[in-house]
Amino acid sequence: MEVGQHGKNYIMSNFPIQKRKLKLAMLGMTEGNGHPYSWSIIINGKYNAQALAKCPYAAIIDYISKQPQNTLGIENAEVTHVWTDDPQDAMHVAEVAEIQNIVSNPKDVIGEVDAVLVATDIGSEHVERCQPFIDADVPIFIDKPLCDNLSDLEIFQKWIDEGKNFISSSAMRYCKEYEPYHQSTHELGDLRYVNVTMAKSWEKYGIHALETVYPIVGPGFESIQ
């Protein structure tokens, strides 16, 4: 069965009786950011313990090894392809997370996967990294921060207006510890000042602070320092 929408045909022969496993590509790695390791493990639900022990990010070794095995893995999704800026990193990520395919160019995954994850945290690079997949209508998850300058934000807004499929977020928005306050802060009284602790640089990690607060207080900030 084919269903056409906006000039495109979507194959639905297995829907809704069967769910086809989504094939994902993990793309990019920048200095100080080990997300390709941890995200691939979390999605695939498996890892090579001996290879993980050689991961250059001690924090990832620590929290992955402490995580109960049955909490890892996303049903009907698998990272099947990986590319990193340094080819040696891709080889190690693939070994750790048992990823089947290493590509020499990120564009090589177009037509091979259902979606890509741009796993880098330099906001000024994200328009360039995402452009080929936007052009090919491949859905994208973009690591935070989405961008760090107004001109790139305007490009992302244009893509939103055009109906392109991408998302970027801090996990802090979804922390269960804050969920009670997403609906009501009445018991806290009138909120006039909010202080949130964040790590490292504002450019890369400030979004964690903002995404913690925004679902609680909503829009209307008068000052941020």
Question: Model regions: which residues?
Answer:
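Rossmann-like dinucleotide-binding domain that binds NAD(P)(H)
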Residues: 192-225
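Alpha-helical elements of Rossmann-like donor-binding domains used by nucleotide-donor carbohydrate transfer enzymes
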Residues: 38, 42, 155, 180, ...
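N-terminal glycine-/serine-/threonine-rich beta1-alpha1-beta2 phosphate-ribose binding loop
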Residues: 4-136, 161, 218-219
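A general structural signal for well-ordered alpha-helical segments in protein cores
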Residues: 36, 90, 178, 209-210
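A contiguous active-site-proximal alpha/beta segment in oxidoreductase catalytic domains
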Residues: 4-6, 10, 141, 146-205
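Residues at alpha-helix caps and immediate loop-helix transition turns in enzyme cores, especially N-
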Residues: 35, 129, 152, 206-209
